[in-house]
């Protein structure tokens, strides 16, 4: 069985790591490189960096820090933010990233997924999906341009349809960002994860809602996700990654230690 992955997520804006709640009201956490180094040292399996306003600003990810991160960590890392072309992706890989993640640009141009997968291999292409649960209708909708709350918009894609579509086009992994849970720290949305898991044949990463160690356990054991991504519990040192892995191992979850 493949080991489950623990993945700290670093949202980047103006060259600094920030964190919001439900994708709003972002506060500054600190500098990118020291945080990345700390997480690698603590035992993270992978890091994900989102340049959160790149797509809504109509630009590509700020590459100045990608190379600096590659110099200080020896674990895989993934970079996202406004990647719209093969050339954009090529630059990020050249600076040392192991994977790229696309989200809003894939919604604008779904064929981008296939072009990137054909060029770099499916294993290097992650699709991020920002889902919002609409309580009145009981439906899960895919949102776009979520890095800037004034420009966030709901698309016409329902979640499960988009999950199927991106796999068809060559997504090698899916990160499901559950916006209702984001930064609230009351647990991942297991109902949503199970629905997605049923139609998702590629690695699935849960994102949004981790507040306690048991939340990671539940995502792995109950929803059978491949990785769990979290931000505020790591940034605010509520959970130590090494201790989390010891706890998960005791609970019967296969983790790298």
Curated annotation (Swiss-Prot):
What Pfam families does this protein map onto? His_biosynth
UniProt xrefs under SUPFAM superfamilies: Ribulose-phoshate binding barrel
Q: Which InterPro entries match?
A: Aldolase_TIM, His_biosynth, HisF, IGPS_HisA/HisF, RibuloseP-bd_barrel
Primary enzyme class:
lyase
Q: Where in the cell is it found?
A: Cytoplasm
Give the protein's function: IGPS catalyzes the conversion of PRFAR and glutamine to IGP, AICAR and glutamate. The HisF subunit catalyzes the cyclization activity that produces IGP and AICAR from PRFAR using the ammonia provided by the HisH subunit.
Alphabetized HAMAP family for the sequence: HisF
Question: What name goes with this protein?
Answer: Imidazole glycerol phosphate synthase subunit HisF
Organism of origin: Mannheimia succiniciproducens (strain KCTC 0769BP / MBEL55E)
């Amino acid at each position: 069985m493949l080991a489950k992955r623990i993945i700290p997520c670093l949202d980047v804006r103006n060259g600094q790591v920030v964190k919001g709640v439900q994708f709003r009201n972002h506060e500054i956490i600190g500098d990118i490189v020291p945080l990345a180094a700390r997480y690698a040292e603590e035992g993270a399996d992978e890091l994900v960096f989102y340049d959160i306003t790149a797509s809504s600003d109509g630009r590509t990810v700020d590459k100045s820090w990608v190379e600096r991160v590659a110099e200080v960590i020896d674990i895989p890392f993934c970079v996202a933010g406004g990647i719209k072309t093969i050339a954009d992706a090529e630059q990020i890989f050249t600076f040392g990233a192991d994977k790229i993640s696309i989200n809003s640009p894939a919604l604008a141009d779904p064929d981008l997924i296939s072009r990137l997968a054909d060029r770099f291999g499916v294993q290097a292409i992650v699709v991020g999906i920002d889902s919002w649960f609409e309580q009145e209708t009981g439906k899960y909708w895919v949102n776009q341009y979520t890095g800037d709350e004034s420009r966030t918009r709901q698309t016409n894609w329902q979640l499960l349809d988009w999950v199927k579509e991106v796999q068809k086009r060559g997504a090698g992994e899916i990160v499901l960002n559950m916006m209702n849970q984001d930064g609230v720290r009351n647990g991942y949305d297991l109902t949503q994860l199970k629905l997605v898991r049923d139609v998702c044949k590629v690695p699935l990463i849960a994102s949004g809602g981790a507040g306690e160690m048991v939340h990671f356990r539940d995502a792995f054991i109950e929803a059978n996700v491949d990785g769990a991504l979290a931000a505020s519990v790591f940034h605010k040192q509520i959970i130590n990654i090494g201790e989390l892995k010891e706890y998960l191992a005791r609970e019967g979850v296969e983790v790298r230690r």
